[in-house]
Amino acid sequence: MEIAKGVEMLQLEFQEFIIHPILLWNDEMAVLIDTGFPGQFEDIQVEMKRVGVSVDKLKVVILTHQDIDHIGSLPDLLENGVSDIKVYAHELDKRYIEGDLPLLKDVHVENPPKGKVSDIVIDGQELPYCGGIRILHTPGHTPGHISLYLKQSKTLIAGDSMYSVNGKLGGIHAPTTLNIMEAQQSLKKYLNLDIESVVCYHGGLSKGN
């Protein structure tokens, strides 16, 4: 689903789950925000082809956090996809993503996905891609959870800091949130943003509420 020019909400299905990575692109490059479950690299390629963006244009991956449904296809992407790709994540989730520590919510997984994080992001940082991507450190769901704000299209990419149902925001998903108080504080960072669209990884697009 097109959110704005050069901003596409992808839809991936895995068992009973529907998840929504985001693809940003312009004439020069593309940015993928989150990579789905393990084994979904082919699904991502299909979605990119649907949008009309070649995988060869993919130069940047931004991971909102360490959970397996967000980092799952990172290894395949790095091995089979693109050369010299930059992978961004917050320092507090980096060691989990790289496999140095067991994933906080997926300790039962014997061989969890892992991949090299090339670049660390910090709160308030602006990445110079596709019109500018502002990083918001929004811990609670995980220690290093980040959300992204696209000023050009007034779009908030909320990751798992919130969920939505049928276009309505549902707030924090308590059962999968490690620190509820932190998560509540994180939501306050959104109050001063000029937001027209919110995309939740679980639930998809919400507008005007």
Where do the PLM segments sit?
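Short Pro/Gly-enriched beta-strand edge/turn motifs at strand-loop
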Residues: 2-8, 107-108, 128-131
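Metallo-beta-lactamase
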Residues: 38-39, 132-139, 143-209
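Divalent metal-coordination and catalytic microenvironments
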Residues: 6, 24, 34, 44, ...
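Active-site HxH/HxHxD metal-binding segment of metal-dependent hydrolases
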Residues: 37-43, 49-123
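Residue-level marker for buried hydrophobic side chains located in beta-strands
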Residues: 31-33, 62, 87, 155-157, ...
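Internal catalytic-core helix/loop-beta-alpha segment
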Residues: 116-139
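Conserved beta-strand hairpin/beta-sheet module of binuclear metal-dependent hydrolase folds
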Residues: 1-51, 147-159, 164
